[in-house]
Each structure stands twice: as C-alpha cells, then as structure tokens.
Amino acid sequence: VAREDQNLPAIPLEPADGLVMLRSTPGGANVTVDGTFRGQTPIELTLAPGRNHNVVFFLNGYQEASRAVRTSAADESTVAVALEPITSSVRISATPADAELYINGQLRGRADQQIELLAASQTIEIRKDGYVPFSTTFISRPGLAQQLVVSLKTLEQQRQENIKTEIAAT
C-alpha cells in the first residue's frame, strides 16, 4: 500500500567474481581452469572468488605450466607465464653444402648443420638458386637421434626427369 512502511525480507547478495588476465609467452597457449577449456592466451576470465582455481597453460612443443589462482570479490589480477620449449637436436645434411636452411619460413643459415628444433610440427625448406627447392613437414622427437639428408636436384636434372621417354618401333 502506498505511503506505508513495509518490511521486506533481506536479499542475499553473492560476491562478484574476480577478473583475471591470463598471458603466456609465447602467446596462443590453450588454457584450462579447473579442468575446463576456457580459450587461448591472452584471455580475460572471471573466476569465482574465495577459492583456489587450477589454471593450466599448454601449447604444442612447450612444457605445460600450471598455476594456483585465488581471486577476491571484484578483484582484478594478471597471471603471466613463460612456457619452456621442448627441443630436440636434429642433424641436417644437404647437398650442395652451401644451400640455405629455412625453418617455418625463417632463414636459419647454411643447410648443412646440427640444429635445435622445437618438438612440434615444423616446415623445413632447403633452397639454393639454380636448384629445385626441397620442403617437408618435420616433427623432432626429444631423446631420438634424428637426421635429415637432402640432395637438391638442379633445375636441368628436374627438366630431364620430366621429359617423357618415347620409344618408336620401326
């Protein structure tokens, strides 16, 4: 009724979630919170306050990292992790020896070398002017002795191989 005092029951309020900014180096790491996938870094998430959350960062070729995160109501925080790469040594032998090695499109020097590669799928290219380039997808495996042996063909060799042989009967 208008203009009359009324007694209403108390309305319980729930504490606001905490806001957490998650970052990783390198970026693009997958993130799970308490076992549930939540996205990729960098990502901003709200987490229930007053309890510990298990945040796990994982990215192909890197060691998994986990952090215990506890938020307070309406609190803002940042969690940043540097993921440790998992690498493997690979021996690359190339002919001609002065051909160039590219890993994922980046020049890494002469092709004939021992190199540390991330234990993830990588594109390896070996190039030299006047030769047919070589390209392959390669996954290095830690703990295994691995070698990639490549002999580039000259453009003339490739042209000769592409000529179809015709045999004429007379």
Residue ranges and their predicted role:
Residues V1-T170:
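Short loop/turn and low-complexity linker motifs enriched in small/turn-promoting residues
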